[in-house]
């Protein structure tokens, strides 16, 4: 994935298409994530972006290898290191 695709992926994962980060009535940040090893939003977004299956699996394996096992862990921990790659 190129840098532009990675940026788009992280934006979409944070949006209503993915984890849906938002403020609740107490102004606290809430989101949805199924935890564990569930990356359903990441997989769906990569598919919708038409990222090849090989490239998507490579990206998701890299996430697993770094301990980013679910969608919210990818957002909380992966964006900076992945976007910083050359």
Regions found by a protein language model. Give the residues of each.
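Short, compact, well-ordered microdomains
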Residues: 53-86
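Secreted/processed peptides and extracellular or luminal domains of membrane proteins
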Residues: 25, 39, 76-78
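Short, charged low-complexity linear segments at domain edges
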Residues: 38-59
